[in-house]
Amino acid sequence: FVKAAEGPVALFGTSADPPTRGHQALLEGLVQLYPQVATWASDNPQKHHGATLEQRATLLGELVAAIGDPRLSHRQELSSPWAITTLERAAAQWPGSELVFVVGSDLAAQIPSWKQADQILGRCRLAIVPRHGWPLTSQHREALEALGSRPVELALQIPATASSAVRERLDPSQIPAAVLPALLKHNRYGLAEPPC
């Protein structure tokens, strides 16, 4: 049980597969908008993951520690493949606080098909972060509103990086400095330290 926060709590679950500079920019932007931000690594039932949940959670935890903002916390206990379960856990952690569920605009079209989508949208305020190449269309917005949501589009500038692209192209420049040593040490995603 955590004491109710002053103001809303932003909730951001991510595959963090691996965490990118885009994740870093998003988390840094969220702490400028919300008094408390919780993040965790999660398994997305619609994705194949390149590392285990435990490994991805460790990497995300390292990124959160490197950001070092007291408004940002790594809350792995919120993780669930199902958003409704995460929201139930968050409501128990922050009773009485407004919960703001943060997703990228690439997921906006998927939300109406999520398990118990109407209940999810009834328990939180939906905040959508623009992602390059994935505009939030009026059709997406109307589908969300039909389920009772009043989505808010956050004015954050996030670098056009995607974990899947980093995995496919092995581009270390898109990996936050705090995460890169662990990827090299453990040879994650094909990134290995050069032999001595």
Regions found by a protein language model. Give the residues of each.
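Nucleotidyltransferase catalytic core that binds NTPs
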Residues: 1-196
